[in-house]
Amino acid sequence: MQSRLLLLGAPGGLGDVASRRVRLLLRQVLRGRPGGDQQRLEVRLLHSGATDSGETVSIGDVSYKLKTPKNPELVPQNYISDSPAQSIVQHLRWLMQKDLLGQDVFLIGPPGPLRRSVAMQYLELTKREVEYIALSRDTTETDLKQRREIRAGTAFYIDQCAVRAATEGRTLVLEGLEKAERNVLPVLNNLLENREMQLEDGRFLMSAERYDKLLQDHTKEELDAWKIVRVSENFRVIALGLPVPRYSGNPLDPPLRSRFQARDIYFLPFQDQLKLLYSVGANVSAEKISQLLSFATTLCSQESSTLGLPDFPLDSLPEAVQILDSFPMMSIEHALQWVYPYTLLLGHEGKMAVEGVLKRFELQGSGHSLLPKEIVRVERMTDSHGSYAHVTIRVAGKEVTIKVPAGTRAVNQPCAPDHFIQTVSHKQLLAEMVQSHMVKDICLIGGKGCGKTVIAKNFAALLGYSIEPIMLYQDMTARDLLQQRYTLPNGDTAWRSSPLVSAAREGKLVLLDGIHRVNAGTLAVLQRLIHDRELSLYDGSRLLREDRYLSLKEKLQLTDEQLQNRSIFPIHPSFRIIALAEPPIVGSTTQQWLGPEFLTMFFFHHMKPLVKSEEIQVIKETVPNVPQEALEKLLSVTHKLRETQDPTAQSLAASLSTRQLLRISRRLSKYPSENLHDAITKACLSRFLPSLAQSALEKNLADAAIETNTEDSLEPELENYKCEVVAGSLKIGAVSVPVHNAHEKMKVPDVLFYDNVQHMVVMEDMLKDFVLGEHLLLVGNQGVGKNKIVDRFLHLLNRPREYIQLHRDTTVQSLTLQPTVKGGLIVYEDSPLVKAVKLGHILVVDEADKAPTNVTCILKTLVENGEMILADGRRIVADAANVDGRENLVAIHPDFRMLALANRPGFPFLGNDFFGTLGDIFSCHAIDNPKPHSELSMLKQYGPDVPEPVLQKLVAAFGELRNLADQGIINYPYSTREVVNIVKHLQKFPTEGLSSVVRNVFDFDSYNNDMREILMNTLHKYGIPIGAKPTNVQLAKEFPLPEKTFMGYWIVGQTGNGMQKVLCPAETNHVDIKGPVLVNMEKYPIEKHEARFLSFTEECTSWKFPLDEVNLICDIAVSHENGEQTLYVAACNPVSLYFMNMTGKNGFFVDFFDIFPRMASGSWRPFVTVAPLGSPLRGQVVLHEEQSNAVLLLDTTGSAIRRLVLPTEEFTSKKSSWWSKEEGETYRMCKEFSHKNWVVFYKQTGNSLTVLDVLEGLAHTISLPINLRTVFLVAEDKWLLVENETNQKYLLTKPAHIGSEDTGACQLYMLKEELPSTGFGVTQETEFCIPDKVSSDQLSSENLTSAVGQKIASPNRILSDENSHATIVVGFPDLMSPSEVYSWKRSSSLRQPSVTSMTMYTGKRTNATPRHNNCVTLTHTNQVVRILPPGEVPLKDLYPKDVTPPQTAGYIEVTDLQAKKLRYIPVPSAESLSPYTAWISAISDTDALLAEWDKSSVVTVDMGGRVRLWETGLERLQQSLMEWRNMIGQDSDKHVQITIERDSNEDVSDPKHGKEDPDNMPHVGGNTWAGGTGGRDTAGLGGKGGPYRLDAGHPVYQVSEVEKDAVPEDVKRAAREMAQKAFQQRLKEIQMSEYDAATYERFSSAVQRQVHALRIILDNLQAKGKERQWLRHQATGELDDAKIIDGLAGEKSIYKRRGDLEPQLGSPQQKPKRLRLVVDVSGSMYRFNGVDRRLERSMEAVCMVMEAFENYEEKFKYDIAGHSGDGYNIKLVPVNQIPKNNKQRLEILKTMHEHSQFCMSGDHTLEGTEHAIKDITTEEADEYFVIILSDANLSRYGINPARFAQILTSDPQVNAFAIFIGSLGDQAARLQRTLPAGRSFIAMDTKKIPQILQQIFTSTMLSSI
């Protein structure tokens, strides 16, 4: 008997400290040679001669007799080391005891290969055969018991591992019990307990004892007939599992747990481990090794797990030491990073903790000099065992050569591969990867698009590996990873190895791309492959590590073939795995894929993003001719975004990955004119970013001096953007490309498409990318024409397309192949995707965002590397060179492209974030609704017959709605599709009104009141009368005009009255021009509101311009030029001018403050009149200040102002300054002919006229013999003058050109007003009255005829004065004969000085008459229009007795001489009035001024700055009313009848009237009575063949629309009472008074809309979180494609169904988000509340937060604090006392109010912010938000904004935002520039505060759910 001593272990000796020290010293000397220690366990193997089973193994005192295995190839090989550690021997001894007892064991312990290795060592020691199964979440009962396979058309049951082990007496090793889904493992319960099991095929497994008992009574044949099978007495189960709950997984089922005996297999004890490491790392100093181990052990301790640090993978330490052994000079800290990448794994605290431990064990700070620099060279060497390479690496100045596995192809030298640019960091990374490659598989971690795949490929090329890329996706099953079933041509089922398995056998390098996506339970099946290089497959074959395979081969003396027949294969020694992953999201609960189990499998290398210099190098070498300047700017922005901590910036940086930058550079180099701003915003898809991110991006771009293209704002003409196909090449815009010659014509789309500029621009952009070979992604709202654009694009390119539409249930299989069963065989049909790849078609992926992102991920490898594995084993590869001669390969056709279409990310679209996951592999294009111009031209083509104004209204209204949607005020983004549908309807049914047709779109919103209100307002603003009834016509009441009176004659220049004509001399001077001075013209947007939205009135449009509260309007004028009207409004306090073109969207404002300073004393009141000039001086205006006689010429196009000095000024008295002349001297300007570019000035009471000819620059002064009162220019050459004091009228005729030699001087005639003879009834003593207005042109002869009532054609003028409504002078001024005067007298004269007005005005007479008499003559419509104050209007007749007349700014009196009617139209009163009431009354006696607008309408401007247009002409009104009624639709109230036309078989006899029924009863049908409905031959309605229709007047029993809509009054009342009662009841419950309720309602209602919007979004989030998932392996549901074959074979659980996925057990609880609102309740809030309501707005904001988050406490926990002079943390709402009802909420608002009223002054904004940010993180939460409201005037309190910015960003975990209230001038804007982008808001208008809050919530909180 020979006995062999197998192993010696070191004890875990417990000697005293001293002896331990001595022992350690000795060990240092002897270096791991075990010294004289105490006794230890030995394993003895005793041979007892030749008998087979006589061998015994004893461990210590336990011994076990070996049996010869039946299948020796199933016994584990080479697991036992020569000297196992003592602790392992202890484990083995325990296992042997349990084995002898016949008990099943459970080895429990931390993740890692140790437990498996202990089990395998024991089985190898006892020569037991093993059945191994790695459980995963995909394991089902069939994997354990029996599986069906089809052989020759029959289904057989094949025993699986558990059954095989039981019958053959093997040991079943179950690994990963915590991975199996609940209730799968109980299948084994009975087998474990009683060794019994019922099988599917009818057999029954019975325990050995019972079977043997039965054998005593029955024969074996009988038992076989009963299908009873004996379970071997040697059958044992060893289960391996992790302790749950410490690790994630399903906890053990109690009945299952009770059937196992457990043993904790913890990491090796310190000493054993140390010894192991010493033996591995002989070159590394012992001290370093023990420090390394101490560090690792510390991180595995119980304390560190409470910190939330994942366990350190101790099992990887030997490999790390092995590397250090080859590179003793390398930094240990760095090697630790590979084993335990704590910088990626842990948050800030975790990192600090780990670094603390590193310091403690002196492992830190070994510097960068000790890192590997680069690979110097690679040499190939092949020996019998496979291929290796010698790689030389330079580390710390030395070169070290190591031997690493290599692939089968030729190796590359480090600098050889083309198109791989080596940067310093990449060289270093490659060197490090080779070091890891020496000992273990690698996992590369890096953000998307940073070049992981490129590095991995380069690494493979370096070592001569073939690559096997495997794209992983989320719902991948274990079968997809290892083996899949398929059918053989004869119908048998078989297993096909996955690429991973074949790669393992062939020694390839496997790229597991996207390992972070796969479920950890699925990856578990790879653990054994990675740790031990062993694998058991579903079909029973096993893969062994090569050395084990060889030793087995040697022992059994078998050939490779024989072993393969026994299904045993070697794994190639060169086989390696590189996993590619994105970094785990620190602190997130869901995406923490890098767990303790995963850490044991790989060495981790972090691929950091490129630094700027390297990125520039990469881009420059890849795209050599990229413009330098653009590149610099691009990278500076990108790196600035990457470096910030701000999550918003981070998400933007993610869209600017290296891959995107390369794409942008490629475009820039090909199209150098490309605008960088566009390129970046396109890459980030900024059009659809939340508003915060958008502003952050804009700010960063502005900082980097990247500007938008200024021309972009203007729309290019369609001429420049034509698409045309010329000579076989397509040209869109500036880009051209040859047209494709398609074979499959029918697949080329052809679509109705109307060209418009914007879509052309988009298509040009797409073409640019298409030419560069990019795949495109079009993102946009619904209905903006994404599909149309793509189809049109492909049509132009003549490319065939394949179309695939994704949806919720799209799976990876359905994207690639569709399996179907035909005749018992599985046949795969190519999906459009595969067809497109093969044939080179264009694949259009529609609704790309609807499929789960884990599915669409597989498109990534296809687009990026052109590789993809199909379900039937074929694979798609990029270059055809690899295809030749290898079957199952499909080469990508060079023409293949993918065009993906997706909706914009984010609410309200419910899609998944396709752009976020895959955006950077496509070139993205944001598709927007067409701009108004493009949209209009497109709609014209859809509705050629729809009137253009209607289309314009639609375009404008929808444009505004889209803006609202972009601002987040409404959720639904209205698109072109909706407008097109409306237009199509109007085109087909022109009589239907617009307002009823738009309801086709807007009825969706009719139940949402907020939304409805916004819609109504917008549509009404653009004059779409939705909700109006055609009967709502509210025109002014008409009164009869008094009869006309003949007033006598005006006689001019007749001799004999002693007054001969007088010649008036004129002198001509040049005008002195001073200037020009540039003036600042401010532009402001104008919102026009159509006035006729609910009822039809004379008013048609109104808008407001931004008038100061104290400013007054003193004159208005309108210029008409080529059909365009421009309105000029002059204001006088301060002097300023507003003007706007009526078709435009913008107004302009010019301030003349520096020319006319406002006087401190206020005694001087400037008064400015304005006269617009005509062409060629169009756009120029003369302004005249009446008291200083200053004449200014403003050029509005060149924004310059000149002063014109008139000659008269020279002899005016030179006073101290020209604006302080004595009172009462006023100069006037006559501007009737200013459009001819001349105006006349005169001084009241003066005796000269000055004619200013602006075009010539001349001034003609005419001296007169009389003192003037007023002047009317009744014609260009005839002027009516009125003398001062006497009011005598004169007519001045002037030659055409003053100053030319040949003409005479001006002539002055006296004008005599002669009364008719007294018989006419006109009294003699008529005082001369001064006309208010004399028209400067005449009535047409038709108008004159109808006015005077006799046919007459003659020159005439119409005038108006205070005594008459209108007066016509026939024959004046051209005929020298006496002119007849006809007048329509007023019942009482206007402006009778009443008592009140006398007291009101004091001072001189000039003040008593207002400056403007507001009278306009519309000669075209025969009307005189003026505005009267309410006192001059017959209000009693206008309004019924009991109605109080409304407040008005005055009434427009329309005297219509055509219809002989008077109408009074009320002008609504001004929204705000200047406090200078006396000044207003000096300007006008009404609060509005009037001017002629065009031939039949007038414009009024009130003192509050609101402009209104009024149509007064009857014809125009008639026409507008028609249009308005058409908009509403005439037939909405008509009685509609349904008629079905069918031929009745009865013939038609002669038509007749039929009998009249004496009783006139209603009749239907028949052939007898007249007046029936639906009969034949007789007259009636809807009949057949009758002579005519006859309605006998029967009532049609139909409630009219109006009545239908009206609910009876009593019902309404009951409803009201009920609501009131409920309200009272509710108040009583919460003890709130009605007064309080009203107060609260005031705050609540102000923010109702925001609350509503937020709650909708929060609801959606709740819903999104609860989306159901596919549950697989169900017994009912839909057939799962992946299990079709199992279905053929007759299995049951082959279905899948949607269900709520239970969270994985052990996965962390979802924590709520924390929000803290810190509001300002300082004294200044109370003090300035009166100015801008800031305190109230803050209270509204608080109210909004409280209301919006009510009932979402489990998702959002909020609290509200205040800061003021009293302190920085005033608790308003503590986190656990959320107010429940309105009363409690009101209490909080009251507290805020009172606090700010009574607190100390001072400011604690900074302290409040700092405290909130520090304090909020004390409690665990998913995300933290702090929002500060402050009105801090930072500079006043001496706070440095930079310090504030620093506090805001002090904790990267906390998203802090600041909202500043207040009007700090430009300080606010300066502040915003210093604060971080997107983090600070300035609320100049306090109304915005709730909106800003809503923005913050929607764009940040919601992004991450």
UniProtKB/Swiss-Prot annotation:
<feature type="transit peptide" description="Mitochondrion">
    <location>
        <begin position="1"/>
        <end position="45"/>
    </location>
</feature>
<dbReference type="InterPro" id="IPR039891">
    <property type="entry name" value="VWA8"/>
</dbReference>
<comment type="function">
    <text>Exhibits ATPase activity in vitro.</text>
</comment>
<keyword id="KW-0067">ATP-binding</keyword>
<dbReference type="GO" id="GO:0005739">
    <property type="term" value="C:mitochondrion"/>
</dbReference>
<dbReference type="InterPro" id="IPR036465">
    <property type="entry name" value="vWFA_dom_sf"/>
</dbReference>
<protein>
    <recommendedName>
        <fullName>von Willebrand factor A domain-containing protein 8</fullName>
    </recommendedName>
</protein>
<dbReference type="InterPro" id="IPR002035">
    <property type="entry name" value="VWF_A"/>
</dbReference>
<feature type="binding site">
    <location>
        <begin position="446"/>
        <end position="453"/>
    </location>
    <ligand>
        <name>ATP</name>
    </ligand>
</feature>
<feature type="compositionally biased region" description="Basic and acidic residues">
    <location>
        <begin position="1541"/>
        <end position="1560"/>
    </location>
</feature>
<dbReference type="InterPro" id="IPR003593">
    <property type="entry name" value="AAA+_ATPase"/>
</dbReference>
<feature type="region of interest" description="Disordered">
    <location>
        <begin position="1541"/>
        <end position="1583"/>
    </location>
</feature>
<dbReference type="GO" id="GO:0016887">
    <property type="term" value="F:ATP hydrolysis activity"/>
</dbReference>
<comment type="subunit">
    <text>Monomer. Interacts with PEX7. Interacts with PEX5 in a PEX7-dependent manner.</text>
</comment>
<keyword id="KW-0547">Nucleotide-binding</keyword>
<dbReference type="InterPro" id="IPR027417">
    <property type="entry name" value="P-loop_NTPase"/>
</dbReference>
<feature type="compositionally biased region" description="Gly residues">
    <location>
        <begin position="1568"/>
        <end position="1583"/>
    </location>
</feature>
<dbReference type="Pfam" id="PF07728">
    <property type="entry name" value="AAA_5"/>
</dbReference>
<keyword id="KW-0496">Mitochondrion</keyword>
<keyword id="KW-0809">Transit peptide</keyword>
<dbReference type="InterPro" id="IPR011704">
    <property type="entry name" value="ATPase_dyneun-rel_AAA"/>
</dbReference>
<feature type="domain" description="VWFA">
    <location>
        <begin position="1714"/>
        <end position="1896"/>
    </location>
</feature>
<feature type="region of interest" description="Interaction with PEX7">
    <location>
        <begin position="1"/>
        <end position="260"/>
    </location>
</feature>
<dbReference type="GO" id="GO:0005524">
    <property type="term" value="F:ATP binding"/>
</dbReference>
